[in-house]
Regions:
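Conserved N-terminal segment of class I S-adenosyl-L-methionine
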Residues: 1-90, 94, 100-102, 117, ...
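Helix-to-beta-strand junctions that scaffold the AdoMet/dcAdoMet cofactor pocket
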Residues: 110-111, 124-126
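Conserved functional loop/turn residues at catalytic and ligand-binding sites
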Residues: 92, 97, 109, 188
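Active-site micro-motifs of SAM-dependent methyltransferase domains
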Residues: 90, 108, 139
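A short SAM/SAH-binding and catalytic strip from SAM-dependent methyltransferases
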Residues: 102-111
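C-terminal beta-strand of the catalytic ATP-binding
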Residues: 262-265
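S-adenosyl-L-methionine-dependent methyltransferase catalytic module, highlighting the catalytic core
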Residues: 114-119, 129-260
């Protein structure tokens, strides 16, 4: 393998998640290796805790999520020192408490986005860091089936497919980069750095993985885990296939996701 198992983000993700989701999380996790995270740190929307536990183990001081069931999984992963069941628009923390807030693939799922952004700014220290990953409007534009339908001039079917995929993904905000920048700036954040990632070829892996990942979904429903046999002998073919993509630079202008590093101005 390119790295030993302890440090290999791709292996750690695909050995415990559906391969398509694990691939995306490994790409995102790799970006965090070059980012300094200052304590106290809040993970906004920690979910099942897998991303935090895998990407920055032991670094998260508080993790919040509205789902108690997800927090039970986060507890089993030891994803944060303290876990709280709460919603993002009403955070149970004092003003200017955190030095860093991270939110990975969460904000797009929140209808009342502006309220949450205002609340994040309240609990973040002056000049504190706010780091997020979100899909942009190229997520639907780059879907392979939609592009094929558009090429065949079946535009209404393409739009239907794009809307269906957004619904499956539970996206309330598949917004353009410009819209994200405007909403973040209006909430009082200074964007220090941003880039797009996950080009069309990588998105196709995610897209088709929703179909081919059905066995993993059944495993989760029946046995409580995505991967029944997380061993290299079992996952070697998919690991080698994904590793060839993972080794490539995933930063791309036409990327379906956007990474933002911000300061509380």
């Amino acid at each position: 393998m390119a790295e030993n198992k302890q440090n290999d983000l791709l292996w750690k993700n695909i050995s415990s998640l559906p391969y398509f989701r694990g691939f995306l999380r490994a790409v995102e996790g790799r970006y965090y290796r070059d980012i300094s995270l200052t304590s106290p740190l809040l993970d906004l929307g920690i979910g099942d805790g897998h991303f935090s536990a895998t990407t920055f183990p032991g670094a998260v001081d508080f993790g919040i999520d509205p789902s108690y069931k997800s927090l039970q999984e986060a507890f089993s992963h030891q994803a944060a020192s303290t876990l709280c069941c709460a919603k993002g628009h009403r955070l149970p923390f004092p003003d200017a408490y955190f030095s860093t807030v991270v939110s990975n693939s969460v904000l797009e799922h929140i209808p009342d986005l502006k309220e949450v952004l205002i609340e994040v700014r309240r609990v973040l220290k002056r000049d504190g860091d706010f780091i997020i990953c979100v899909p942009n409007d190229q997520f639907t534009q780059n879907l392979s089936v939609a592009r094929l339908l558009n090429a065949l001039h079946l535009r209404s079917l393409a739009v239907w497919y794009q809307r269906l995929f957004n619904k499956i993904s539970r996206h309330y905000h598949p917004d353009s980069v410009q819209e994200w920048q405007r909403n973040l700036s209006e909430a009082g954040f200074q964007i220090v750095k941003t880039w797009n990632y996950f080009p069309p070829k990588s998105l196709a892996i995610l897209e088709w993985g929703h179909l081919f990942g059905i066995p993993a979904w059944l495993n989760k429903q029946l046995f409580g885990r995505w991967i029944l046999f997380p061993k290299m002998w079992n996952l070697w073919p998919v690991y080698k296939w994904l590793d060839s993509h993972y080794r490539m630079d995933q930063t791309a202008q036409d990327g379906a996701y956007s990474f933002f590093i911000m300061k509380n101005a």
